[in-house]
């Protein structure tokens, strides 16, 4: 019995010794090997970016869309330490360079970095990322992300805007970033010692961003941009912008800027990029010139001070305080009706009507038409313009303001003001987002600024601008009656503070059909250099070319 107990004790102590020895071996003698084994599996929680919301035009044409991509990174230590990398660093760099879009020398430098993490490429298209993975280079790994793609490249580029690393930089991408970006998900990734994933599991699924449907029509936008490009080639202006709008709703069918911006290949210079991204349809502050004359005329009509047929004795110049203001061309003293004053764009006539109203009444109508305030179009960078208070008027202000000098407006403000006249006197908020996730955008109600009868009288008078003897008489669209107003405004020289004799803004704003307007177009050309400086010969023909396409395209009946 004692012998049997002794055997059991011997066996027990033998097993205990073996366990102690194994512990000593694993914990002390083989700890480095164990650490290497543990390191063969690394667990990380990675963020999975949400697909950004798609932006389409009014007919569903995709203008901006997210697609899967990968950020490609490398652990240079793992690359250099791998004994199986027979191709060497130079060979690895040679294979990687064309896939990640970098020079071979740049990739080689990255692979030689004294760091455990280096980006080789960000937002690499999925197909190219897959090709990188297929190289089986140790330490090279990919992290899922999304990349924003613009299928039409330059189309509505300043409206859409661009993305930065932390969200939208400009345009709608910036203005609606909160709803476009969605909500990122998370995933659990187990990787081997070479950084290659062994298993991937979702922790939280990502939530895609909202889908934006715009009021923009891609075909009208394309036509508008093509016309502005032609203006650029012929007149070589500093820049140009155009807006096409439905006056009854305020829906913007096109908003174009020139020079164009390539969203696929934007400028690398920060200053150049910022200038190219500027949407001058909402940000350009300028003195409107003669397109502003409808403000004084509309106010005087509404107050009952004049009628369309009221006659005025108009010389070719007028003295206001210490200033002498001239009509564009010399002429003998003549009798002009209100309608003829608009059609021939008489400065003296507009000033005469403005003086009938007086400072306070004129200022009231400036504000009624929406000047001095943002329109609420929903695009970043919108300016308010600059409108004087009557207390800020000088003795000569009523010689400047009725003819569009001395106050600043934006193209979108001018388009909205004319849209109110086209829409029976009701001013509506211009808008460019039609729906979010299929739900129609909520829009404020319009409000009346002039009576329907006054709006109709102004529309009728504006037809004379495109009739024989008008300042845009050579512009026509077969089958359609047109109405509108030219503007040629001298810019203030920033060095002298005086009006320049070489720098002008040429503009035209009009609508059709004249008696029942369905479509409005505004064209503003900043500092045309060659050929002409006048709104009637620079901007008005561009208006005609845009409307010549858009009216029949939209199925608007001739009239």
Each language-model region and where it sits:
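Hydrophobic alpha-helical transmembrane signal-anchor segments
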Residues: 1-33
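Small/polar-residue-rich segments within soluble enzyme cores
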Residues: 29, 73-74, 87-99, 109-209, ...
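Conserved, well-ordered alpha-helix/loop/beta-strand core segments that scaffold catalytic motifs
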Residues: 117, 196-240
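Second-shell loop/turn segments in exported
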Residues: 41-45, 72-86, 93-96, 114-122, ...
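Short beta->alpha transition motifs characteristic of CBS
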Residues: 50, 66-77, 254-260
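Beta-lactam-recognizing serine transpeptidase/beta-lactamase-like catalytic domain environment
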Residues: 64, 191-201, 242, 246-290, ...
């Amino acid at each position: 019995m004692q012998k049997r107990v002794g055997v059991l004790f011997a066996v027990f102590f033998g097993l205990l010794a073996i366990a102690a020895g194994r512990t000593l071996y694993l914990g002390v003698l083989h700890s480095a090997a164990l650490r290497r084994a543990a390191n063969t599996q690394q667990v990380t929680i990675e963020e999975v970016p949400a697909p950004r919301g798609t932006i389409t035009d009014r007919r569903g044409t995709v203008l901006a869309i997210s697609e899967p991509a990968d950020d490609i990174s490398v652990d240079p230590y793992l690359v250099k330490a791998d004994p199986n990398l027979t191709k060497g660093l130079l060979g690895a760099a040679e294979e990687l360079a064309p896939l990640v879009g970098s020079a071979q020398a740049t990739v080689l430098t990255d692979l030689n970095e004294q760091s455990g993490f280096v980006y080789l490429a960000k937002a690499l298209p999925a197909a190219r990322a897959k090709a990188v993975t297929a190289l089986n280079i140790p330490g090279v790994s990919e992290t899922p992300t999304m990349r924003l793609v613009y299928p039409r490249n330059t189309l509505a580029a300043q409206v859409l805007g661009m993305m930065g690393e932390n969200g939208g930089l400009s345009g709608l991408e910036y203005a609606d970033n909160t709803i476009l970006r969605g909500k990122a998900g998370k995933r659990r990734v187990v990787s081997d010692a070479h950084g290659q994933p062994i298993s991937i599991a979702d922790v939280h699924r990502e939530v895609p961003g909202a889908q934006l449907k715009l009021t923009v029509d891609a075909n009208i936008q394309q036509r508008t941009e093509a016309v502005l490009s032609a203006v650029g080639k012929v007149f070589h202006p500093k820049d140009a912008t155009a807006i096409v709008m439905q006056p009854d709703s305020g829906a913007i069918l096109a908003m174009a800027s020139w020079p164009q911006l390539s969203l696929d290949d934007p400028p690398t210079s920060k200053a150049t990029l910022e200038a190219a991204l500027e949407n001058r349809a909402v940000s350009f502050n300028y003195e409107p010139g003669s397109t502003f004359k409808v403000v004084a005329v509309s106010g005087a009509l509404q107050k009952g001070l004049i009628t369309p047929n009221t006659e005025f004795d108009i010389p070719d110049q007028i003295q206001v305080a210490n200033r002498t203001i001239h009509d564009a061309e010399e002429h003998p003293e003549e009798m002009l009706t209100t309608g003829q004053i608009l059609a021939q764009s008489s400065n003296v006539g507009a000033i005469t009507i403005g003086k009938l109203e007086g400072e306070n009444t004129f200022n009231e109508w400036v504000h009624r038409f929406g000047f001095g305030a943002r329109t609420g179009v929903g695009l970043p960078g919108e300016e308010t313009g600059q409108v004087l208070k009557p207390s800020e008027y000088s003795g000569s202000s009523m010689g400047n303001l009725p003819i569009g000098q001395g106050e600043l407006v934006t193209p979108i403000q001018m388009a909205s003001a004319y849209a109110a006249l086209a829409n029976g006197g009701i001013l509506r908020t211009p808008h460019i987002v039609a729906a979010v996730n299929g739900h129609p955008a909520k829009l404020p109600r319009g409000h009346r600024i002039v009576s329907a009868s006054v709006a109709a009288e102004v529309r009728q008078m504006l037809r004379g601008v495109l009739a024989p003897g008008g300042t845009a008489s050579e512009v026509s669209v077969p089958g359609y009656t047109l109405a509108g107003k030219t503007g040629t405004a001298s810019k203030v020289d920033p060095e002298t503070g005086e009006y320049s004799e070489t720098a002008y803004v040429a503009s035209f704003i009009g609508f059709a059909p004249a008696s029942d307007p369905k479509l409005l177009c505004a064209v503003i050309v900043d500092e045309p250099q060659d050929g002409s400086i006048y709104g009637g010969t620079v901007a008005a023909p561009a208006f005609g070319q845009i409307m010549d396409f858009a009216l029949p395209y939209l199925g608007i009946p001739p009239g």
